[in-house]
A protein has these predicted regions:
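Short, structured secondary-structure boundary patches
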Residues: 71-76, 294-298
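A conserved beta-strand-loop-helix scaffold within acyl/acetyltransferase catalytic domains
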Residues: 53, 57-61, 74-75, 82-250, ...
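Generic alpha-helical structural element
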Residues: 4, 27-31, 154-161, 178, ...
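Acyl-donor binding region in acyl/amide transferases
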Residues: 10, 20-41, 49-50, 113, ...
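Short polybasic/polar patches that bind polyanions
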Residues: 43, 170, 174, 266
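Short alpha-helix boundary/capping motifs
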Residues: 69-71, 197-198, 316-317
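C-terminal domain-closing interface element
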Residues: 295-343
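A eukaryotic "domain-start" boundary segment
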Residues: 1-43, 54-56, 60, 64, ...
Length: 464
């Protein structure tokens, strides 16, 4: 049984991406016992987690709309710059001396060489220089196994908090992102990037799948140089965060880690690779769309659409794009291309949904390592709670009031100290309205509208 606490629909006063004060709107909840299958369901409805805080952005009311992006790993076609990032690291690790000796002691057949040259295999490429997988033929004279120039190891480990990891994280945040040191105490690191989803093993078709939150740790000559924070789900590997030692920033860790994670998806059968949110207006985020073919979750229909040049052109012109909404408008309201989403009369100002962003000055193209990862949710002190019910705001991907009214919300549980109570047994339950956020029924209705009905029977609400 999931135990959730509700923060509700909130508007932030500051954007961590564009630094403007327009901010964005999201629905927030917290859960410290989230199941991997439930989180998979939430991600496919546009949710994301930061520690035990879960949030679903309201894209039309965001200055920088967050689009869920994923890749079917088996279809991945590496681009030149992605291949170069892995090849550069492999060449450094192996070294010229090892390469020369290995070519003499165990030469590759020509057809194998030709196959490798003509076809890039991401799984083989990412493991090529890993020490435990590297061939170590014995020298004819020395009778000793030849060794690479460096010992490179990649291991999937529990997402535990250690001094070694925290030290790397602290240097990364302070030197790369210029954060103040006080912001990333060991407790903060543990809260946001450690002890996430519960870990367990699942056997599927003879394969053992690891599930839950893990750290993919990269070590060079015994030293921890980078850590990828991952959520392993029944049908996906979700990239949560990446941090690395600034002494090794010459390596393109954004591409290197993504290719290792794609290889993990392929090898272990997770099927999809989620890279968090894609923010088209943030140039540092566009590297995510370079892993092709990537798909964007339609905010309205919750279907997946290919992120191709046609889609990018739409995003160049409009911050908010929903192909299903565009099709509906063209079919029923004309083909002027404008988004006629009905918004309520509100006292607060809203960012324009159809704002033309082509006139804005774009940031220069960036090196691969200069990447922007998903920011954490807004500080509660930097938010405000809009008036009215969630159903007044017509949020994409959220159940409408009429849809929620058809659900039996009373079967959901309320956690009171250590006891679970059916909501329908509460005094006043039948009189309460689902569009009244001041009642427990209204709170539950908004929660299920945003999470979807599948979580209804497995969730308990904690109010205190």
């Amino acid at each position: 049984m999931l135990t959730t606490s509700i923060a509700g629909y909130q508007k932030s006063k500051h954007c961590g991406y564009c630094k403007q004060k327009d901010g964005s709107c999201s629905y927030y909840m917290s859960c410290d016992n989230m199941r991997v299958d439930h989180y998979q369901e939430l991600m496919d409805r546009g949710w994301r987690r930061s520690g035990t805080t879960y949030y679903k952005p309201d894209l039309p009311r965001s200055c920088c709309p967050h689009y869920t992006i994923r890749l079917k790993a088996s279809d991945f076609k590496a681009k030149k710059e992605q291949r170069s990032a892995i090849n550069k690291l492999n060449s450094y690790v192996i070294g010229p001396e090892y390469r020369r000796k290995a070519a003499m002691l165990c030469p590759e057949p020509r057809d194998i060489k030709r196959q490798k040259r003509d076809h890039f295999d991401v799984v083989s490429a990412v493991h090529k220089a890993e020490y435990e997988r590297l061939a170590k033929p014995v020298g004819k004279k020395t009778k000793d196994a030849i060794q690479p120039a460096h010992k490179f190891e990649v291991n999937l480990e529990p997402d535990s908090c250690t001094k070694e990891k925290h030290d790397v994280m602290l240097r990364y945040q302070t030197e790369i992102h210029k954060d103040p040191e006080w912001r990333w105490t060991e407790a903060s690191f543990e809260r946001f990037l450690c002890n996430g989803l519960d870990r367990k093993l699942l056997k599927v078709k003879g394969k053992t799948m690891k599930l839950g939150s893990h750290h993919m740790c990269y070590r060079l000559d015994g030293k921890l140089v980078a850590v990828g924070v991952l959520d392993l789900l029944p049908h996906a590997v979700s990239s949560v965060y990446l941090f690395y030692d600034p002494d090794y920033q010459e390596w393109d860790w954004g591409k290197i880690s993504a290719m290792h994670e794609i290889a993990l998806v392929i090898e272990k059968g997770y099927e999809y690779y989620y890279m968090g949110y894609y923010i088209h207006s943030c140039t540092k985020m566009r590297y995510k769309g370079r892993f092709e073919p990537s798909y964007i979750l339609d905010p309205e229909s919750l279907e997946w659409n290919l992120l191709d040049d046609e889609f990018r052109k739409k995003l160049d012109k409009r911050k908010y794009v929903s192909l299903s909404e565009d099709q509906r408008i063209q079919a029923h309201e004309g083909s002027d291309g404008r988004n006629h989403r009905s918004l309520p009369n509100e006292t607060r100002s809203e960012p324009s949904i159809v704002e033309d962003v082509t006139t804005k000055k774009l940031e220069p193209e960036l090196k691969g390592e200069e990447i922007e990862l998903d920011s954490e949710p807004s500080d509660p002190d930097d938010t405000e709670i809009p008036d009215g019910s969630l159903f007044d705001y017509n949020i994409p991907g959220v159940l409408k009031k009429g849809e929620v009214e058809k659900l039996n919300l009373g079967t959901m549980k309320l956690l009171v100290r250590t006891s679970l109570i059916d909501l329908e047994d509460l005094r006043g339950w039948e009189e309460w309205q689902i569009d009244d956020p001041g009642t427990i029924k209204g709170i539950v209705a908004e929660l299920i509208a945003t999470t979807g009905p599948k979580l209804l029977k497995d969730t308990a609400l904690a109010l205190f």
